[in-house]
Amino acid sequence: MTSYTFSRELRLLTPAQFKSVFSNPIKASSAEITLLAIPNTEQHPRMGLTVAKRFVKRANQRNRIKRVIRDSFRLNQHDIPHLDIVVLVRNGVMEMENAEINKLIEKLWRKLSRRYNG
């Protein structure tokens, strides 16, 4: 049975793991969200997430955005190649509804997969 959890093994946890993604990444971006990725040696993708206070002032809004992105990753993890991915949230995402964020991030998952595969 396919698991749709977002367990600890699917997360980037240490600063070193985040830093490695920033060196020569594969990119997929929109005006509001940027995905940076590098191939990993695991049998599954891993994700790290940053939402800066500079762009999203209120904690409840940052948490909402992170929750929507994590949920999208959780549901799409089996369609994403074995990559370490860092999601950077930029200005403008705060005005978006949850459904809009979800639609945008799913489009970016597909774009990232295409760039990695060919």
From Swiss-Prot:
Keywords recorded for this protein, A-Z: Endonuclease, Hydrolase, Nuclease, RNA-binding, tRNA processing
First-level EC class: hydrolase
GO BP of this protein: tRNA 5'-leader removal
Keyword Hydrolase: yes
One Pfam family hit: Ribonuclease_P
Enzyme Commission number: 3.1.26.5
Catalytically driven reaction(s): Endonucleolytic cleavage of RNA, removing 5'-extranucleotides from tRNA precursor
InterPro entries per UniProt: Ribosomal_Su5_D2-typ_SF, Ribsml_uS5_D2-typ_fold_subgr, RNase_P, RNase_P_CS
Family: Belongs to the RnpA family.
Subunit structure: Consists of a catalytic RNA component (M1 or rnpB) and a protein subunit.
HAMAP family listed in its UniProt record: RNase_P
Name of the protein described by the UniProt record: Ribonuclease P protein component
